[in-house]
Swiss-Prot record:
GO terms for biological process: ribosomal small subunit assembly; translation. InterPro entries: Ribosomal_uS19 (IPR002222), Ribosomal_uS19_CS (IPR020934), Ribosomal_uS19_euk/arc (IPR005713), Ribosomal_uS19_SF (IPR023575). The keyword Iron-sulfur does not apply. One of its GO terms (molecular function) is RNA binding. It comes from Elaeis oleifera (American oil palm). Transmembrane segments: none annotated. This is Small ribosomal subunit protein uS19. One of its GO terms (cellular component) is cytosolic small ribosomal subunit. Belongs to the universal ribosomal protein uS19 family.
Length: 153
């Protein structure tokens, strides 16, 4: 009996330490990704993103990155930066954008998206759905031939 209570005391005295999985993108740690130049970073992306970066970032994507830099710079330490609104749904997320808040336009409203490390290499559009998912209900009048015999409510 005494042995059982001793085992419980030993287990309760030391709380179990939680270990978090360290993020890596294609085998490269987040710290290294942030220090990496564009040329090395592009080599890690999938083919479509590589092609996009090799063709060069045009004026609008560069303007978005500049606005994100400014929002991060103006934010007080420890606080989240101000959201930056954009229509650029086809912008590929790069490590520099991590921690920023972006309002992505879905055709009607701006959905706020906080950029996390897991989003690297994806498009902004993937995180702001542009349609309302279908909620299938009962079929309407004229949906099938048998619906002629369904009374009108």
């Amino acid at each position: 009996m005494a042995d059982v209570s001793d085992a419980v005391d030993v287990g309760g005295a030391q709380p179990k330490k939680r270990t978090f999985r360290k993020f890596s993108y294609r085998g490269v740690d987040l710290d290294q990704l942030l220090d990496m130049g564009t040329d090395e970073l592009v080599k890690l992306f999938h083919a479509r993103a590589r092609r996009r970066f090799q063709r060069g970032l045009k004026r609008k994507p560069m303007a978005l990155i500049k606005k994100l830099r400014k929002a991060k710079r103006d934010a007080p330490p420890g606080e989240k930066p101000e959201p930056v609104r954009t229509h650029l749904r086809n912008m590929i997320i790069v490590p520099e954008m991590i921690g920023s808040i972006i309002g992505v336009y879905n055709g009607k409203t701006f959905n706020q998206v906080e950029i996390k490390p897991e989003m690297i290499g994806h498009y902004l559009a993937e995180f702001s759905i542009s349609y309302k998912p279908v909620k299938h209900g009962r079929p309407g009048i004229g949906a099938t031939h048998s619906s002629r015999f369904i009374p009108l409510k």
